[in-house]
Each structure stands twice: as structure tokens, then as C-alpha cells.
Curated annotation (Swiss-Prot):
Signal peptide: none
Pathway(s) served: Carbohydrate metabolism; D-galactose 6-phosphate degradation; D-tagatose 6-phosphate from D-galactose 6-phosphate: step 1/1
Segments traversing the membrane: none
Pfam families named in the record: LacAB_rpiB
Organism: Staphylococcus aureus (strain NCTC 8325 / PS 47)
InterPro entries to which the protein is assigned, alphabetical: LacB, RpiB_LacA_LacB, RpiB_LacA_LacB_sf
GO biological process terms, semicolon-separated: D-allose catabolic process; galactose catabolic process; lactose catabolic process via tagatose-6-phosphate; pentose-phosphate shunt, non-oxidative branch
Domain of life: Bacteria
UniProt name for this protein: Galactose-6-phosphate isomerase subunit LacB
Keywords associated with the record: Isomerase, Lactose metabolism
EC number assigned by the record: 5.3.1.26
């Protein structure tokens, strides 16, 4: 299976270990960054993971930032993504089996790497269980999506990157 994997600068080391875990399980990893500890902005990498999944380049996605909240909010803004921020197995399985989630998000400073890898493995191996109720719920969620043509612009985040470069954001 192809898994898109992205993170911010706070948890690059965690992402690399998750990547190694996924590869050891025979999965192909599409690493969309970030690749080092240079300060960056998490929405960029949430967006990249979401785009890989929605385009079909990846089967599923994994997003990690310090708490998981920011990157998971960002990836959920990509039309077609259904991502769940999880800290436990039950939530991850519910997201996949009932809501057909295609991305899973984690707080790398909140959850341990071993548990994270166990949850990712279970999420990948779980199957969506379509029911009429689930289908209707997913349709209602999808109806909430609105497309914003500006998101396709590769310079969409330039304003924020320039602020990072000027030191206007702090960890």
C-alpha cells in the first residue's frame, strides 16, 4: 500500500521512525516532508498529504505535528479528505470502519511512537464497513466541503513562509 506521510519540524524524527516502520511492513512511503528541524508551517505538509491521497497517488495518509491538532485541521481542508486525529486504537478503527477515513493524524509529542505505529498498522489493515447509515453520514460530511481554487496555487502559503523567514512566528 502507498502511504503519504507528512509532518512539521517539531516531529521530523518521529516521522522518520514511522516511515521506517511502514517500510518494514512492506508499504511504499511517499514522504512529503518536512525533512529536517528547520522551522516550517504545518499546514503545508497537511495539504501535501491530503493532495497525495485525494489524487490517488497514495492510498492513505498519515499526518504528525506536535499535538496533531494543527496538521489534522489543515489536511481536513483538502476536499475529499476524511482525517481523524487519534490517540487510541478504538478511535482509529472507528474512523476507518465507520467513516472511511483516508488520513490519520497524530500528536508526536502526545502519543508514544510504538503506540502510534500499532495504531497506524491497525488503521491500514482495517476495512470500511459500508452501511446505509455510514454512507449517508459520509455524504453529509462531504456536502460540507467547499472548493477554493486558490488552494491549487503552489504559492498558496508564501505569505506565511515569508513571515517565518522574518521570525514573526515562534515555537
Amino acid at each position: 500500500m502507498k502511504i503519504a506521510l507528512g509532518c512539521d519540524h517539531i516531529v521530523t524524527d518521529t516521522k522518520m521512525r514511522v516511515s521506517e516502520f511502514l517500510k518494514s511492513k512492506g508499504h511504499e512511503v511517499i514522504d512529503v516532508g518536512t525533512y529536517d528541524f528547520t522551522r516550517t508551517h504545518y499546514p503545508i505538509f497537511g495539504k501535501k498529504v491530503g493532495e497525495q491521497v485525494v489524487s490517488g497517488n497514495a492510498d492513505l495518509g498519515v499526518c504528525i505535528c506536535g499535538t496533531g491538532v494543527g496538521i489534522n485541521n489543515a489536511v481536513n481542508k483538502v476536499p475529499g479528505v476524511r482525517s481523524a486525529l487519534v490517540r487510541d486504537m478504538t478511535s482509529a478503527l472507528y474512523a476507518k470502519e465507520e467513516l472511511n477515513a483516508n488520513v490519520i493524524g497524530f500528536g508526536g509529542r502526545i502519543i508514544g511512537e510504538l503506540l502510534m505505529c500499532d495504531i497506524i498498522d491497525a488503521f491500514i489493515n482495517a476495512e470500511y464497513k459500508p452501511t446505509e447509515e455510514n454512507k449517508k453520514l459520509i455524504a453529509k460530511i462531504k456536502h460540507l466541503e467547499t472548493s477554493n481554487a486558490d488552494q491549487a496555487d503552489p504559492h498558496f502559503f508564501d505569505e506565511f513562509l515569508e513571515k517565518w523567514d522574518r521570525g514573526e512566528y515562534h515555537d
